[in-house]
């Protein structure tokens, strides 16, 4: 991390960038938050560790409107989102200085809680320079030790790879964390009967409190004005009118980002209710791969997505209906 801070200070000092977009410590050891740093002194508060899971690419939409370049720290999976935003003309590549930061998997504090680890005071073993094999957690109830991989976010177990798709320079080593099939959970749901699927999603989506965290964190949700904020559609309220409305919110949002979602997993990571929202998007990704050939949104900043282009080899719409 010190190398990252030192380089950021250099780029600020020589005028290459006007600000740095990274993370600073939050009020809890597992809760770093996104922050801008405009002076060398402020960078002393910069942090980067296993809990810095937030995808900063969406914040570059507003940063692109500011004077001067913004240095932004992007993990390998974040760079897919940035590429997709370039493709959609939502960010200005010339206004960004991208430092690709190493990643050895990001941590999910909810997994720690499910293990019964509470009252956390400090955590070691999650720094960029660590091997990220063992986590040592100090709590008010005593010390706990666990395997790093047991506390990783779901998305890290199905990682797309540790190669940065776009960058100006790379700092820090990455580590392969993939140990599961990306579509295993989707296939499990596909095998359910229609009644079982309905019951599964009814149970999960009934937890929704309509906080809009998923939409606000999602890089693919980049509309200047969201349809769900329009008073014309009676959907500006935060509390649900009925359970059906909440189901439609998530289903419609999934349709809106289909073909553009990079599967960054931010929707599920930020959900305070623990709803696996990424499963909707991953189902679309799986179907797109099946019908149009394997495609990864954000793998580059030029190619057209399968849902925004046409070829004579495209699957006929009836095939989807026949499959059921």
Q: What feature does the model see in each segment?
A:
Residues 80, 216, 269:
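Short alpha-helical basic/polar micro-motif
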Residues 178-206, 220-324:
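Ferredoxin-type iron-sulfur electron-transfer modules in oxidoreductases and energy-metabolism complexes
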Residues 1-5, 211, 264, 277:
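Generic structural signal for well-ordered, non-membrane alpha-helical segments
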Residues 72-75, 208, 270:
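Active-site-adjacent beta-strand anchor residues
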Residues 149-166, 208-214, 221-226, 264-267:
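Cysteine-cluster motifs in flexible loop/terminal segments that predominantly coordinate metals
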Residues 78, 214, 276-277:
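Helix N-cap / loop-to-helix initiation motif
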Residues 1-201:
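Iron-sulfur-associated redox domains of electron-transfer enzymes in respiratory
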Residues 15-18, 89, 211, 215, ...:
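Short secondary-structure junctions and interdomain/linker hinges
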